[in-house]
Amino acid sequence: MQAQTFSHLHSQSSQRTTEVTLYLTIPESYRQEPIVTQLVSRYQLQVNILAATLGTNGGQGQFKLTLIGHAQAINNALAYLEQLQVTIVLDQESDGW
């Protein structure tokens, strides 16, 4: 999913705290990488894991997460995930605030 899907986060102050709930599908090639941890350490986000599915013998990982932090930090984190070719789907119940 492209970053413009999350453009509503750009329209407010980058220092305003916001939250967004989304679904991630992480490719198998990143199975051993600390991708969710990077969202906390690199982007100073609070991450709430609402659901997760990982295959026991490999495969992709699927997560439902709530990200809480400054709008700019969330956008930067989403750009990082897109660089990794993680599939991002915004939860339609989430309004980003």
Curated annotation (Swiss-Prot):
Q: List the disulfide bonds.
A: none
Q: Give one Pfam family, short name only.
A: NIL
Function according to Swiss-Prot or TrEMBL: May have a regulatory function.
- Organism superkingdom: Bacteria
State the name under which the record lists this protein.
Answer: Uncharacterized protein ssr2439
